[in-house]
Every structure is written in structure tokens, then in C-alpha cells.
Amino acid sequence: VRGRDDACPGALRLHPADDGSLARMRVPGGLLTGRQAVALGRVAEELGDGRLDITSRGNLQVRGLDAGCGAELAARLRAAGLLPSDRHDRVRNIVASPLSGLDGGGHADVVAWVRELDAALCDGTPAGGGELSGLSGRFLFALDDGRGDVAALGADVTLIATPDGGAVLRVGGPLPGPDVPSPPTAGTRPDAAGRRGSRTAGSAAGSGLRVRSEDAPRAAALAAVEFLAKARESGTRAWRIRELPARHAVTTEGLVARLADAGVEAVPVEREPAPRARATPPVPGPVPGPNGRHALSIALPLGRVSAAQWRLLAGLASRSGADELRMTPWRGVVLPGFAPDDTRGALAELSDAGLVTTPDSAWLGVGACTGRPGCAKSLADVRADTARMVADPARGVAGTAPGTSGTARGAADPAGVVADPAGVVADPEAVVAGGSMPWPVSGTAYGGGPAGPDPLPVYVSGCERRCGHPGGRWVDALATGDTDYRVTVRGARGDTPEADSTDSVDVTAEQLADAVAAARGTT
């Protein structure tokens, strides 16, 4: 039983940190117009420390804010269309397939789903999502276009587009892959579906529900309403689906009934063996599209950009013709709408500015927590130490993305690291599971192609909380003092820092590159 509400920062709830207050702006699906991007850049420059951080949910953070700037910040966000509902500010947590509709992959363009779900979340009427203002700031929706990229990010409610133009609604945990089983025939009645659901394990997370594409966003919102009802029943003040006790789980039968009451037909999908989806980021570089236009995929060193870098991204978004910037849950950016002849010049501008535009960058696979001076608990300035580690040309510590040559491009200006609020141990946008930082998944090339053994992801932490560390197997570089680190390979067969660790090596910051390079090659 939780004794308090979650403390996730928002645009209206600033979080105090050692380097000033922190604001987190929810950006559903990571979708921004060029005008909105410019407005956010001005917020960072004029109110914050001049930098922006992309979180593991494709949201934005600004640090270094004055504690009294909340009213001005909110007014600027409202004017830019980035704060449609004060009551629902922190619940608009939606990740979406960032290349949806751009590269010919997937089964549907889920951008429309993003817009409709966001509207449903902010609908304050009883017939809409009025209850949803009670969701925790940690509750997450994922909208997958069928390629399986965001379906594995452990969202509370996930929609997966299917080849026949429909959708599967899944509730809870890490999800099976995009090859979802075929639903029952369209003639199956909801009452029969409910009876079949009652014979399952009783959790909608176990099988999923087939819904029409046009009903999918509303079905996702109603699944969240069902969660809130179960959370109240349980008296546990649960923040996430997985925290509900078994006797108060969101069941297939209960969810089918709630959807039916709202006029949404939902048919349970039979559980069948399916490979787990792998959450893989778009490959940095040009992304050809079937309409003759190209998108640009850019990774950000440690998830942070300077105001100048952000202005460049916003300017290119406006010049492209699409006037759109998409932030990814891997702390990258996708810019749609470029003519093929314009991509080379745009990528050169981005690379010259210190951003990652090729899949062979030494920054790929490297993450770090906030560290000093932003976090009082950190023992070291891990951002600076990580930048020196990556830039060490003699060691090539970061290795390369699998299947690439090893050239370290885009490492000129790390611009800092992703901002995780100091003191928030279980922040969902800091604690990263299942590879949702910009690193390859074991056994695949960057972007999902087959490859040989991959270099392990590296995470540099300022204290033993290890805020933001990846799941799976990873290299843990833990600060033990101002200039000292302990390097360990962790998580060989588990997701906790204590699982199956190798022997540790204690080194100075100057020796970190060698130690991490050796550990990263461990298989």
C-alpha cells in the first residue's frame, strides 16, 4: 500500500534539485510542430539553464529553473498548445512508433491514435476521460504501429496495429511481438467473448482484446478508467497496472464489459506462443519513405541538447515541409519530410553541431545519470567523466554499434546527459528497462538487423541508486568517490543490479575508458 501520491515532476509541478527547479513537459507521442519546438527552446534559454533533455518516454525536461517561474512557464506552454489541460498535465504519457507513416513499415500510421488518445485523456466530461486526471504521472500508454518497437517498453496500456486494419489492446507488462494472433471472426458476439475471457488467466495483460482501429484510442482510455476503478477497490493507491494485487487485477471479462458499456466491441485474442518484441531505436541517418520523402533520424548524446542544437533541429523541422519534430523513447529525434537531395546537407549540419547522424557513433550504447552538480546524492560529475571516456581515441571505449566500422562521429559536444530528477528513485523516465535507452538489443544490429555479439550497454552512475540504468546485461560504472569508479558487468540473467554480477574492478576516472572497454566485450 502506497502512503503517498507519486512525485513525478510536470509542467505545473516543479521538482527542486541542486541546480534549480526541474520541469517535465509531456509531449504525447513525442510530436511537436516547428513552432512548438521553437517555444520550448526559448523556455530553456530564457527560464532554464539553456539545455533540454529528452526522457525515456519522449518527453522534455528543462533544468535550472527559478522556483518562482511556474506561472510564466505555464503561460508560455499554454500559448504554444503544449498544456491543453492543467488537471491532466502529468497523465499525458504516450509513446508511439516514431517512424510510423514515414518508412512504409508497420501496419498503420498511429499519429491519429496519439491525437485521439490525448484528447480522450484530457476530456473532463463524465462521458469522456474525466476520471483520468487521477492517473499517476508514471502510468504509460504505448501506441505501436505493428513493428514492435514500442510494444516492448512495458507500458500499462498498449495498442498494436494489426495487418487487417484493426488493433489489439493489451493491458500490463512487457508485451509479445507484433505478430499478434488472428482474432475471432467479426461475427463473434461480445457475450461469447466475455465467456471465453473468463476461462483465461483472468488478466487482460495475458491475451489482449481485438478492437476496431477507430475505437482503439477510446478503448485505451477506458482501460485506464478500469485500472483506476480497480486501484480504488484495492485501497493500495497503485500507480501502475503491475502494482495491482491479483484479486484486484484488470480482467479480460471486466474490461470487455466496460468497453461494451461504452459501445466499443472487444473480442479476446487467444494466447498463442509469440516472440517477445524487441525495442529498437531508429537507426541514425536518412530514412527513405514510400512517398519519395525522407526522414532524418538523429540520436542525442546522453539525451541532452544545447539551445543552439535545439534551434537547429527546430529550424530543420520547419524547412522540411512537414513542420514536425518527433522525439523518441530512445532519447532521439526524427525529422520527417525531406526531399532526398536535401538529406545530405541537413545531416552534415546536424553532425557538425555534435549530434549523432550515423550508426557508428561512439555515443550509441552509452548512458549516464544526472550526477553532480544537479543531484546531491551523486559522488562525481558523471557527465563530464562519461564525455571524456567516450572521447578517448586510444581506447574506443564505447565500441561501436553492432556491424559498423567503429568511427566515432557525433561525439564533439555531448551537451550533458538526460536529466533525472534528484531524489526520485523510481522515476519511470529515469529507470529504464528492456533497452529503452539508445542502445542496441542483444543479438541484433542497431535498428534490429541480425548481427554477431553486441557490445554491452554502458551506464555511468553517481551513486548506488543507479537512476536510469538499463535492463538486461550491462556494464555498470559506479562512482565511489570524486574521481574513482567501480566497473562491473551486471544482469547476466536478470534485471536487477545484484543479478549475476562479474567481479568488480576499481579504477580512477582516467582509467575508466580502459576498464569499460574491457568489460563491454564480455559475453
Where are the language model's segments positioned?
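Short beta-alpha connecting loops at secondary-structure transitions
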Residues: 176, 205-209, 371-374, 492-505
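Small-residue-enriched alpha-helical segments and adjacent helix-cap loops
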Residues: 20-170, 175, 179, 201, ...
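Glycine-rich, small/acidic residue-mixed loop/short-helix segments
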Residues: 481-523
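Gly/Thr-rich phosphate-binding loop signature of adenosyl cofactor/nucleotide-binding cores
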Residues: 1-39, 260-263, 267-315, 319, ...
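Long, low-complexity intrinsically disordered regions
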Residues: 183-185, 257, 261-291, 413, ...
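Actinobacteria-biased recognition of intrinsically disordered, low-complexity terminal regions
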Residues: 1-12, 180-200, 400-450, 518-523
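Internal alpha/beta scaffold segment
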Residues: 175-180, 200-235, 243, 247-249
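Flexible, glycine/charged-enriched surface loops at secondary-structure junctions
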Residues: 51-54, 128-135, 229-279, 322-329, ...
